[in-house]
Amino acid sequence: SFTPVQTDYVAADFDDVVFEVKTVPSTTTFTIQMPTAETGTGATNDGTLDPLPYILIGNLITTPAYGWGAGTWGLSTWGTPRTSTTVILDPGSWSLDNYGQNLIATVHNGRTFQWIPIAGTAPALTTRATSLSGNPTKSVMSIVSDRDRHLIQLGTETTIGTPSTQDKMFIRFSDQEDPTTYAPTSVNTAGTFRIDSGTRIVGAVKGKDYLLILTDTSAYVMQFVGPPFTFSIRQVGSNCGLFGQHAAVYVDGAVYWMSGEGGFFVYDGTVKTLPCSVEDFVYTTAGDNLGVSFNNGEQIYAGHNSLYTEINWFYAKAGSNFVDRIVTYNYVEKVWTTGTLARTTYANTSVFPLPYATKFTQNIAPTFPTVQGISASQGNTKYYAQETGVNEVDAAGNETAINAYIQSGDFDLDVEGDGQFL
């Protein structure tokens, strides 16, 4: 899609409108769909157009890549499409963090942007984010060290501005109070690290006075220590890798996460395995039980519900391309539950009195913002206020009853058969 700006077209329905590109007939032309059939020649012949393309943020789901270099040497003949590949493309995702009043946003394996809500006299909602100068062009994610105001790029480029040098175990941190300067000098605090336990940094979470960085196999703690080293970094766990970028959450002094190696973990000064009574149900696909989809682990989202002292992990079951299951841990009662609930993201109560979440549905055209020629293939996201009422109420006030049920598994009775309740 693109937004036309600075146009001289006279057709009012063409000016400053977002369009979906329908086809690309050549390297210099593309096709869009107008809201109504043209009755004159204005939109065809008048003026010039400066298109402003949206940023490509990646695939909708984890996708195998079958292009040049897929497979082993000599696997097939020249020019023959490959039917197998070891190259996997991650789904598009974002890491978001505050740098003071500004928002820092990094596309997963992409660029970093900054949104400045107060920029001159322009209203915040009409102000667009812009690419943050001086930053790497390909990083797994970014995170801000609040205590000392460094912007940290994880899984980033060894040569800034050269995407082919991305090293998914390489870490850069900016100069203090300057998120655009990464070159270390004798008078600034910018610097780099490379960690070595694992093959890629998957995600990171802020703790009380540290950052917990999780690879696909291990856990590291990164802490601000001041000059001359700025940061220290040490490995605190192994065989505890993170499943997906958003599969970890900080709660009351500890970080909880779901591992791609099986099981749940917590870091509260040391890495510990979290006992889980439903681990087999969540991880194992056997018979009619469909465990987690390992192919879509990047979609897992961990959310904290402080109203009920719960941590929720939303995940896609085996055979599903999108999130449709939930596993919940009550960290006060130390009780696990599972369920069917599709939530793509989840935000705990903070500024607002209720938790809020989103749900993505495939093959439904979005309704906001208005995009001319939009197709259902783009999918639709709903925004939910959680933990209010007992039914689902849409934006128009239409109420739908939520079907609820309880399902349990086998469990042992007390030897006397007493004290059991359902």
Language-model-detected regions and their locations in the chain:
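Short consensus segments that form the blades of beta-propeller domains
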Residues: 9-12, 94-95, 209-210, 318-319
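Hydrophobic or amphipathic alpha-helical targeting/insertion segments
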Residues: 30, 102-115, 123
